[in-house]
Structure formats: structure tokens, C-alpha cells
Amino acid sequence: MKNFILLVFLFLLVSNSLGKSNKKDDQSPEIVKINSNDHLPLYYEIIISGHFSIDKTGLTVTYLGDKIHDFEFIKGQVLNVTGEPQNNPIPTVSINPDQLNDDRFEVSDSSDFSKQTPTPTPTPTSKPTSTPTSTPSQTIPPTVSPTVPPQTTSPTSKPTSTPTPTSTPTPTSTPTPTSQTIPPPTTTPKPTKSSKPTKTPVPTPTPTRPSSSVSKGYDIIKFNITDIEDIEMGKITISYKNGQSSSKHFQPNSIIKSIERTNSVGGVVEFKGSFFYTDDYEPSIKIGNKICETLTSSQTSIRCYLTNGTGCGYTITIDNLLNPIDNNGNSNLTYCYANPIIDKVIGYKDKKLTLITIIGKNFLNNATVIIEKPNGNKRNCSNVLLSTDTLFICELSKSYHTLSSPKTTNTTMLSFINNSPNSTVSNEIIEMISGYFQIKISTKPSTTDDDNNKNNDDGDSEIDSVGKSAVDSSKSNNNSGGGGNKKLYLLIILPTVLFIIVAALVAIFIKTRVSQNSGSKVNKNNNKKDSINVPFQMLDEITT
């Protein structure tokens, strides 16, 4: 009779717990938010946060109408739980142990792992002890008896450790737990429980992985998409077998991972990343106030043609693109033209009207060159002789004839300013603004004024921004102008005049010996030779 009453009592408890679990299972799913992580070209991860139940409901995930067969489910925590992360809010699912052996619910091991920790300590202690085994054996179902205490003790077992022995079903087992319940919570329960099921390798990482989302109390569903062409904006639905469902619209982010910039003369700009479009039309791209004409577009690359320009901070606007952001999640996208590159600077620091030659890339026609003295005085290289995107030649003003005083070693600055908005920008600002460049020029110390004058005549002090070897003085004299050029003109004129006289005499001599036709042919050939050997521009400049 006593056994019958005990069985009836246990039956009522089990039915009550089943009723509560079924009541919880009747709650409809709720999608709170949808996030995504771009790991392309490997995979694209979609994360659904909300309140879901995977047990006894047949949870189904659909994306764009297609069922997702492979997904990961992570159970969240109750917000008011202050204990260890293993404590989860629904330990009642453990009442139906047959459900846990079903392979379909293998993704719910995170909840199974959490339900093992709240189970009372008498179960692990009842196995090694010999005396209390007789009392649990009379209760017949050992798997059901541990589920009875979780319903009544799971809320109260967390604040204090003393109520755990008082909630045991039989008074005979109280002596053993009181002496053994203190050490087991730190030593025995975790190894015995983790070694019990074969699924423990799966739930062990789950309490730590959703730690950031678990703190918000949300359940997590994750699934991956490996083909970028399958990623579109659309509806994601979580549904149960009983017909309850929850849907939310998903819109992926287009991420610009890198930008291949063009030079100052204009060219092709290429955006690389993961791009998702609102429709089938090509995107419309605008950089600053300039339209970048679209050439090609795909889900991994966008190419457009941009006209000439320079500088940084141009806003990028791409229409027909879903949520364009950069790698850091910033939606304010900016573009910079390729920086001007100075390969070499050639000039003479002590000569009047010296020519400064700058060789590099990405120059503008309206670029200016400023030479700055150590005392802060600046001189413009104002007389521009040649200006292209790769070469800039200018003549230094007359007032700038000494960069450093004799017998001292100073470092002067040659600042190449590309499209400068303000010619009075300080050196510190110039170094920080994109599009501005400074070259440090080391000057050699002069021992005497005579040595300094010798340097002026021979051109030994050459400016070289990259520390390369100096150009030969003969080549330098050609660029500097002055007396050296006059000597060169004389050396060219005298041999040329002699050559013309000799050629004329030879022509007259040939005319007297050869026929008139052959003489005319020889005269034409001589005229061709003269036009090749005589530098016409040099002669023209001297005569004028």
C-alpha cells in the first residue's frame, strides 16, 4: 500500500512537470534580431537571436523559403541567474530522457549539458555508497527520482547549499549527503556528469561561445552559407510543428575590403569585397563631386573610371548597394587619390638661378615647389620650365643663393606641395596631410668662403632626396645654364662652321667633275647630314 501511494505521488509529480514543459513548449518562437559575419570566400555566417525551444517542437529554420538542414542551436540563460554559466533556465526537459538519444536533437546538447549540473548531489553519492542504495532501489525508476528534486529545488538550491540535503525524498539518505555534499560540488559532480553521456565533447564549448549573447538572455541559432551567390535579402523564419512561427527580414551588409586607387591623372578605381545589390542594375558611383563611371560590377569587385585629381577625404557614394560599410563597420566611406611619389630631386644649393628637377609620379600641372631655409624663410621655385605628371623642372629665384652659412652643417627642407590649398602651411602640418611631401636635404659644411665659391663654380653640392650618388658635373652644368652653356655653344659653332665650309668646297669640287644630275644628288645628301649634326635650336638661340 505504501509503495502504491509512493508511485501515485511520483506519477503526479512527473505529470505536473510534463504539463509545465508542454506549457513552455506551447510558447511561440520570437526572433529579436539577425546579425551576420563575413568570412568570405570561405563562408558567410548568419546569427539569429531570440527565444526558441528545440525540444518536442520540431524547430525548423528557413531562409528565402529554403529549409536549413545544418544549423547550430545555443540555449540562452535567464537574466537573474547569478551563478555559473552552466545553469540554464529549463531543466525540466530532462524528464523525457528518450528524447536526448534522438540524433535529431544533437544540436541541443547545450541545454542537456546545463540540465546535468542542477541535478541534486544525492545521485552521485548514491552510487558509491552501499547503505542508501537500498532505499533508491525501492523507488524502481532511478532516472525519474533525480528529476523530482530539480522541480522543487532548482530555484532554491542556488542561494544556499544547506537546502540540498533537506530536499531529498527519504530521510535515510540525509546522513550520507550531509557528509559528502560539501566536497562533491567542486570535485565529483563535474567529472561524473561530464563522463556520463557520450555527447559531452559537443556541449563543453557551448557555455563559453555564446557568453556575450547569453548575458542578454537570447537563444542563438547559427548557420553558414558557402556560396556568395546564394546570399540575398529576404525573410528568415523559425517555425514549430504545431504551426507557430516567427519571421524577420534579413538584409546583408556590403563590405568594401580594399580600394585600388588611381593616380593624379585619373584612371580605374577598383573596390574589392562582398557586394549585395538591391536590383539587377549596375551601381552608380560618385567620389566627391565627380562621377566614377561604372565599368564592371560583380559580387566581389566593382570597377569604375575616375578623372584626374588629388588629395584625400572624398566621400564615396554607391547607389544600388545594400548597407555599404568598410572592414571596421563604418558607413562613412572616403577615398584618397594615390599619393605623389618623389623618386629623386636634383639641383645646386648655392648657385643663383639654379634649376630644381623633381622626378616622380602623380604630379599636377599646378604644383609648386618651396625651398625653406633653416631660419624658416621660404623661397618659391616659381619659374616653371616643365610640368608633367612625372617630371617637374623649375628655376629658383635670385634672392635665394645661400642655404647655410659657412663652417656650419644644417639640414634644409625642400617641400614639394601637390595642389596646395594654402602655401603657408607649416612643416608639421605638411608632414601629416596626404598629398604633401617633404624632403630633407643635408648640406656639406664649408670651411672657407673660397671653398664655398669653388662649390658654386664646380657644382659639387647637389641636392638628392634619396641619398643617391651625385650626377656628373658635366651633366649638371648643362642644366644649370650660365657661362658653361656659352662655352658649349662656341664648341658647337666652330666645328659646325668649319664643317659647312669644307662641305661646300667638296660640293663645288664634285660639281666640276661629275655631271649635273649626280652633283644634285650629292648636294641633297650633304644637306641631310648637316641637318642631323647641327643642333638647330642651339644655333638659333645664339644668333638671336
Curated annotation (Swiss-Prot):
Residues 84-99 have a biased composition (Polar residues). Residues 511-544 are cytoplasmic. Pfam families: TIG. Coiled coil: none annotated. Residues 20-489 are extracellular. Its main location: membrane. One of its GO terms (cellular component) is membrane. Residues 126-142, 150-165, 189-199 have a biased composition (Low complexity). Keywords: Glycoprotein, Membrane, Signal, Transmembrane, Transmembrane helix. Residues 1-19 form the signal peptide. It is found in: Membrane. It is a single-pass type I membrane protein. Glycans are attached at N80, N224, N308, N332, N366, N380, N410, N422, N478. N- and O-glycosylated. Residues 84-215, 444-480 are annotated as: Disordered. GO terms for biological process: hypotonic response. The chain crosses the membrane at residues 490-510. This is Glycoprotein gp100. It comes from Dictyostelium discoideum. The lineage of its organism: Eukaryota, Amoebozoa, Evosea, Eumycetozoa, Dictyostelia.
